[in-house]
UniProtKB/Swiss-Prot annotation:
<keyword id="KW-0732">Signal</keyword>
<feature type="disulfide bond">
    <location>
        <begin position="277"/>
        <end position="288"/>
    </location>
</feature>
<feature type="glycosylation site" description="N-linked (GlcNAc...) asparagine">
    <location>
        <position position="64"/>
    </location>
</feature>
<dbReference type="GO" id="GO:0005576">
    <property type="term" value="C:extracellular region"/>
</dbReference>
<protein>
    <recommendedName>
        <fullName>Lipase ZK262.3</fullName>
        <ecNumber>3.1.1.-</ecNumber>
    </recommendedName>
</protein>
<feature type="active site" description="Charge relay system">
    <location>
        <position position="306"/>
    </location>
</feature>
<dbReference type="GO" id="GO:0016042">
    <property type="term" value="P:lipid catabolic process"/>
</dbReference>
<dbReference type="GO" id="GO:0016787">
    <property type="term" value="F:hydrolase activity"/>
</dbReference>
<dbReference type="Pfam" id="PF01764">
    <property type="entry name" value="Lipase_3"/>
</dbReference>
<comment type="similarity">
    <text>Belongs to the AB hydrolase superfamily. Lipase family.</text>
</comment>
<keyword id="KW-1015">Disulfide bond</keyword>
<feature type="active site" description="Nucleophile">
    <location>
        <position position="163"/>
    </location>
</feature>
<keyword id="KW-0964">Secreted</keyword>
<comment type="function">
    <text>Probable lipase.</text>
</comment>
<keyword id="KW-0442">Lipid degradation</keyword>
<keyword id="KW-0325">Glycoprotein</keyword>
<keyword id="KW-0378">Hydrolase</keyword>
């Protein structure tokens, strides 16, 4: 039986099972900013050699969050690591898997070279980026071991990460369901600045397997625009626009996002508005961040937006133990790619604040 057909049969069986147990479907998923802020702190902690200060500041003692394991493996031929850690709470009956983001400029460069087109089959779910697939395979055993511990078998699972960490989270979560370690309704995923991980076939399979999943995007963060999607050539940009075009929801050749985007067009300070991006194309809502045309020759603002979420510089915040008294430099002057943010936000019909 072909792999794609085997996966389709497996997926149909899985959906039948989940319907009996009351699957947590997309229509039930509600973005929780308080929860997202906590997961951002945990994602920041992954950049530190010692994650315990962030864990202690993120959760109350009553939740009894305990560090279960840490991992760091060589990701590529220059020795860049794929790393993360796993936290467990017996009180909440919850396991949280956290992946670290890009740590060095050389690693960012390698990601750029190898994310041009999804080309590696991911267990019959569709094609994904080879570099991300390699990182997933090298870290998977640590996740599998943790979720297979008998006393934790019924615990809910959260998966999170920033940047590269978000990409690894995006592969880890559907693999958990695919391998039968958890049912769909037991998993929640929130990522920050996640790049496109696979093609549209992977996107559709992911959405079925992990319905509670959000990609948080800060304004003009450049990374979620990479690798580029195939543009819908049937779309005619309006007169006077910058010529930006939506992703083609049919093409299987390029990158295509999965999960619901949560877009913050501003600086993500306390009280800033955000959008739940459920418009078309599905998972690539052209009324949200994908409406911005990114100039890869001038990415200062886009890189700043990528490193700064919820008012903190993510890697430095984690290295500083997630100390809320830390101060960070403000954003550069918003020009070019972000000049459209105000008008886009103003005409967007779906605002949840």
């Amino acid at each position: 039986m072909p792999k794609n057909l085997r996966f389709s049969v497996f997926l149909l069986f899985l959906l039948c099972i989940n319907s009996v147990f009351g699957e947590f479907g997309p229509e039930d998923a509600q973005y929780n900013e308080t929860e997202a802020r906590m997961l951002l702190s945990l994602s920041a902690a992954a950049y530190s050699l010692d994650v315990t200060p962030c864990i202690g500041r993120t959760f109350s003692p009553a939740e009894n969050q305990t560090l279960l394991s840490t991992f760091s493996v060589r990701c590529d031929f220059v020795g860049n690591p794929c790393a993360g850690y796993i936290v467990v709470s017996d009180v909440l009956q919850q396991i949280t898997v956290v992946f670290r983001g890009t740590k060095t400029s050389s690693q960012l460069l390698l990601e750029g070279w190898t994310t041009l087109k999804p080309s590696s089959d991911f267990y019959g779910m569709g094609l994904v980026n080879t570099y991300f697939r390699s990182g997933h395979e090298k870290t998977w055993q640590y996740v599998q071991d943790a979720l297979s511990i008998s006393q934790y078998r019924n615990y809910d699972v959260y998966v999170t990460g920033h940047s590269l960490g978000g990409a690894l989270a995006g592969l880890c979560a559907p693999r958990i369901v695919h391998d039968g370690l958890r049912q769909s309704q037991k998993i929640k995923v929130v990522t920050f600045g996640e790049p496109r991980v696979g093609n549209i076939e992977f996107s559709r399979a992911y959405d079925q397997l992990v319905p509670y999943s959000f990609r948080v995007v800060h304004s003009g963060d450049v990374v979620p625009h990479l690798p580029g999607c195939v543009k819908d050539l049937s779309y005619t940009p309006p007169a006077g626009s910058d010529g930006s075009m939506p992703c083609d929801p049919v093409s299987t050749n390029g990158g295509y996002h999965h999960a619901i985007e949560i877009w913050y067009p501003g600086n993500m300070t306390q009280g800033d508005p955000f959008m739940v991006c459920t418009g078309l194309p599905r998972d690539e809502d052209f009324g949200c961040s994908d409406s911005l045309k990114v100039n890869l020759g001038d990415t200062n603002q886009g890189v700043w937006d990528h490193r700064n979420y919820f008012g903190v510089e993510v890697p430095d915040f984690g290295k500083g133990g997630c100390d809320p008294s830390m101060t960070f430099k403000g954003p550069p002057t918003k020009t070019g790619v972000l000049s459209l943010v105000g008008s886009v936000f103003g005409r967007k019909r779906r605002s949840i604040r």
